Amino acid sequence: LGTMVTRYYVESLGGDKHVERLILMGGPHKGAVKGLVSMLVAPEILPFGIMGERLRKILLTFPSSYQILPDYSVGTDQYGVKINFLEESDWLNPENLPLLKLGQDFRNELKPSAAIPYVSIFGYGIKTISSVSIRRDAAGKTESVDYLRENIGDGSVLEQSAFLHGSEIHPVHQHHGSLFVDNDVKMRLKVELTRPY
């Protein structure tokens, strides 16, 4: 989310007058399916799913959870209907709808392509949640969720979401949490930070 907040500064708050070039590392520019899954299904962080449902309900109160929802259809229901969770609200309780609206507003303010020269550094080739299949009840509420993992991301963010259209790209075969310690990435950062202006 830090990359998206940085883009917001550059694109909407006048940061383009102060920033010449921006390096984006592992940013979920088109959203993160993994974050969505934690909102739909109780995360299994502790053994035996202890406190999983409580954690899911807490995550639903975080504005940032809605800001990183995928901006394209990643879900399919039992009838084959595609679901864009950023645009659709049936999956949420009424008390969460204002947060969804804030997430939509934030995403609408971001430009779809690079406003200044950007470099997108991202991981690829690691199993990453890429889509969800849900079963809904008659009211449209989610009853069950299954998800698909494919080798098309960094374990957290899909490749297609991690680079901004119009930016230079620097892919590395690495997990999301390891991008900052990868030797290839450190060398690219050194090149970027020491280049003449």
Language-model regions, residue ranges each:
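Helical cap/lid subdomain of alpha/beta-hydrolase-fold lipid enzymes
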Residues: 11-197
